[in-house]
Structure formats: C-alpha cells, structure tokens
Amino acid sequence: MDTKIGLEVHFQLNTGKLFCRCPVEQSSGELMRFSRKLHISASELGNIDAAASYESMRSRSFQYVVTDNSCLVEMDEEPPKTPDERAIATAISVSKALNCDIVDHITYMRKIVIDGSNTTGFQRTAIVGINGHIETSKGPVRISTVCLEEDAARKIEEIGNTVVYSLDRLGIPLIEISTEPDIVDEDHAVEVARSIGYIVISTGNARHAVDAVRQDVNFSMGYGRVEIKGVSKLTQIRDVIRYEKERQENLRAAVDLIKSRGGLDRVSFNLKDVSDLFAGTKSKIIRSGIESGGVYAGILKNMAGTLKNGKLRMGKEIADLVRSYGIKGVMHSDELPGYGLTQDEVEALYRYLGKGDNDAVLLIAINQSRVKMIENSIFDRIQKIISMDLSETRGPAGEETVFLRPMPGKDRMYPETDIPVIKVDSKLMEMSSSIKPRTYAEVVQDLVDRYGISKQNAEYIASEMVVDAFRNIAEFVEAREAARILTQIVPDLERRTKKIIDHDRIIELCRRSKDLHFDRYQLEMALEILYERDDVASVLGDSRLKELSREEIKSIIREILSSGRNATQNSIIALIKEKTERVFDPRVAMECFNEVKNKNNVF
C-alpha cells in the first residue's frame, strides 16, 4: 500500500497579537464573559463546507472569557488592525530559511470555522512563502506553503451543549508550515518536524507556552486523506502515524468481512424505542438513559463480530461519532451481555429486533428529538467506511486518534474584506534579514560551547525545542543543573503525573529558588510540588521544602536503627524518605549515617 505522509507545523509567535496591539501573554484572570451562537453560511460560490455543516448540526452555544490581553478585535466588535510587522518579517525570514519563494503581496483570506474557536466564525490566514524545500536524511521534503494566520481561542471546558473558550490565545500570530506528502515513514516525520522547528524557534520570536507548537499530520494509505490535528509532542507524531496505519488496516479487514456477508442494509437500520423492554433492568446506564429521554436500538446488518473483536473495532468508530454530538450512552452486541444487562434481557432485545446470526445490534441512550439525526449520521459514517473513504479530521488521544469532524474543503474559503493587501517591500525584506534562523547543528554546538553541557544533553534540548527555556533557567541555576531539569526531572514528572507544566512557571520557580538560596535538592523537591499544585506561590510555602538539619537527620537514623531495620549505605536514603517528606541532602545523610553507626559501634 502506497503510504503518503505530510505535515502542517504551527508555531505561535511572541511578537504581539496579529490584528491588534494586545500582548500575547495575559497577566490577570477573567475580566468578563459573553455568549455567541454561530450559524453556517455559504462560500462565495454558494457552496456549504462539509465540516462547517457538521458543526452546525451539533447546534452548540459558545461562551467566551475575556482576558486582559484581549480587546474588541477578539470580541469581533471592532475591525482588525494592520497585521503586526514583526510577525510578518518573521514569517518571511522563516520562508527564506526554508528555500521558499516569497510572494509579492500578502493577501488575507477567511476560512470558515464554526466550532466556536473564533468569535467571527472564521480564521484569517495568508500565504507568505511557496515552493520551498528542506534537506533530510531520507531526501528532500518539499514545502508547499508558509502561512501567517491568527491562532484560535483556547478551549477551557464543555458544559452540556455549551463550550467555554478563553480569548487569551485568540489572535496570537501563528506560522503554519505545510509540507508536500514526501515523508516516507513515522521516524522521518519526526525528523522533518524537528528540522522545521529548529528554524522557527531559532528566530527568537517563537512563543514557548505549553500549546505554542502544534503539528497536524496528513496521512493516506490510499483510502483518502486523514488529517490528525493538534499533535503537541514530537514523539506523539510517531505514535499516531503507527496507530492510524493499524486502524486503517483493521477497518479494511472489517469491511471485507461485512461485504463477504452481503454488505450493510439501510432499511434494517432503524432506531426503535426499546425503553419498555428494560422497564425492570438493574443496569445503571440503561436506567439513566430511560430517565433522560429513552433507549433506542437498531440492527446493523452483517456487522456481528466487527464492532469489537480483537483488532476489529468498528464500534469505536461509531462511539467517537456519537460522542462528538455529546451522547455517551452507546453499547453494541459485541460487548453484550454487559453493562449490567442480563443474558435474558439481551436475548429479549434480539428477538424484538429480529437479529440474525451475522447481525449486530446498536443500543443508544438518546432523546427522541435527536433520534433521526443520529440514526442518519451513524449510517452515513458506516457507509462511508464500507466504501473505504476514510478521509476525515481526527485528533490525538494518547497513542491513538479519535474522530473530530468531516474533512473540510475549498468551500470554506473566501476573501478577507477588512485587511488591505500588504506589499512585501524593501522595508519588510530588510526586517526579515535581521532575523537569522539557525540549523540544528549550529544550535547544539552553541549550547555546548556557551554553557559547557554535554553534547547529548544539548542534542536533547535542541531536539525537544526547549532551547529558550534552558537559557532562561540557566540564568538562575548552574547550566548542568538546568540541563538536568529539562532532560531528566521534567520528563520524569510528566510521565508520573500525566501533566504538562508551562515552562514559564518552571522558569519562575527557578528564579524564586535562587532568591531563597535553595540548593539542588530543595529545587528538585519544589519542582515535584509544582506538578502537584501548579501554582508557584503555594509551592514556596510548603513545609517539605524546609531542609532537614544534620541533627534532625541523625535523629531519624537513630530511630531507624533502634527499630531493628537492616540499614546499610545502600538502603539508608530510602529508609529516611520513608520517615519524612522533607527535603535533605543525600550526601549529608550518608555522613550522618556513618557518624551514628560508628558511634554505636564504639559501645
């Protein structure tokens, strides 16, 4: 199978917001909120985009949190201002470093987006560079476009049918670099993303928040293009490509099985109200479904054993779709009896529906008013998969991917009328020439020469694109300790806590630790506490950061020895940690252990 892979790599810039003069960082919390309901509109040719149509069907409301780095432009109550010149110059500089042709005029377009992530219902985007390329270990990779666009609002939470967004991220300049499908495999994709990342980050104008770098992976095995949006970590690129390969291979196997039995039948799939069949059920999910609207079931002809059977997981495809409409109570016959349903209840359901041996049954808790819409959506999705048209937009979920929405098309683009065309003149070109991106090798060598860290640590820092974070941390702690924080301590804490802390907070903690004269062990303890609490101020007041004195350490050691524990030089540190959560210097603890042990031996 001919696999094609391409990337769209997005980098936020720290230049100031793109269409107003607000800063990219906020210094206070919520100022106010307002609500909107977005409605679909046709393109200039009169067509309606499939992705926009899908979002419209979800009929959601949106609430926006106003922050101190947002204004009337983000609220869509005032026209956009002239685009930030420094952001444009940075995009031109990056385009040149990627061997692109620079456009003569920058013309903004509107891209319809009605998922609530922009108050206007569209995103402004413009092409800056075209027809570039980068060299890689597996040959050249063509760069199709470099765009400068506004970032979307940041999703905070979903409450029922309402989505809450913050305006703090809306309007931040975003460089989007799109490659042609020249990437040969998942490891090559990681290499390409890194190579592009070094160039953008080394401009000095890239933002370094948790969500400042995002990759979209375009993947095809001949069954249509799948766009996996919002991959935040480089290593996750490898994971989602591997998963998507396996997913599509397994869907092919499921489809072949369904077709060998005669295929899917639209007439048979008719969601019927089966609430009365479960009037006395002990299943909490079914009871809850009946109370909230009703339980409906339908036959999926010839699909038995394809919904959840080893690697065949068509049921997940259905569940992902239904979940996107805010519906959670979905069950199917490949996992029944289960969920508190008895064998007798399941058999009664099958008899009522007239289930055949090769048929599957779908059971869903849903309000009656949404039944027909969900029924059509489910059937259309299954039919699309059976035709092996797998094109759609998906999102990362750990090492897997989940359905987000149909693939958008050209019908969502139309001209921007509020922003004049920008001529790329000598002034912009001169500004861009003062911004000098560097290669990976240059960045690594500079870290080794300037800070005296090992080449291995320098390569990790460069490859993970945390160079600026390292430099900022190294202002407050010794360079080797700064490298250790980013290469060992932070990755370990992220694995253990499943949390990602913004580098700005880590830098602030290091700054405060210098003021408080923390030693290495107090700082490392403070970092652990930061991953518990998120807030730097509350971390510094934690009693665990009060370092144990020599006498306190000796007292703990005496207690351990008197209890009869077999304390040795290899075990004493762990034994002390069992007795106290407070921080201590292991070297001092070893000295105290030897002193106490020797004194005991005298007697």
Swiss-Prot record:
Keyword ATP-binding: yes
A GO MF term: glutaminyl-tRNA synthase (glutamine-hydrolyzing) activity
Catalysed reactions listed for this entry: L-glutamyl-tRNA(Gln) + L-glutamine + ATP + H2O = L-glutaminyl-tRNA(Gln) + L-glutamate + ADP + phosphate + H(+)
Domain of life per record: Archaea
A Gene Ontology term for the protein's cellular component: cytoplasm
Entry-linked SUPFAM superfamilies: GAD domain-like (SSF55261), Glutamine synthetase/guanido kinase (SSF55931)
InterPro entries: Asn/Gln-tRNA_amidoTrfase_suB/E (IPR017959), Asn/Gln-tRNA_Trfase_suB/E_cat (IPR006075), GAD-like_sf (IPR004115), GatE (IPR004414), Gln-tRNA_amidoTrfase_suB_CS (IPR017958), Gln_synth/guanido_kin_cat_dom (IPR014746)
EC number: 6.3.5.-
GO BP terms, alphabetized: glutaminyl-tRNAGln biosynthesis via transamidation; translation
Keywords assigned: ATP-binding, Ligase, Nucleotide-binding, Protein biosynthesis
Job description of the protein: Allows the formation of correctly charged Gln-tRNA(Gln) through the transamidation of misacylated Glu-tRNA(Gln) in organisms which lack glutaminyl-tRNA synthetase. The reaction takes place in the presence of glutamine and ATP through an activated gamma-phospho-Glu-tRNA(Gln). The GatDE system is specific for glutamate and does not act on aspartate.
Family: Belongs to the GatB/GatE family. GatE subfamily.
Record text on subunit structure and interactions: Heterodimer of GatD and GatE.
Name of the protein in its database record: Glutamyl-tRNA(Gln) amidotransferase subunit E
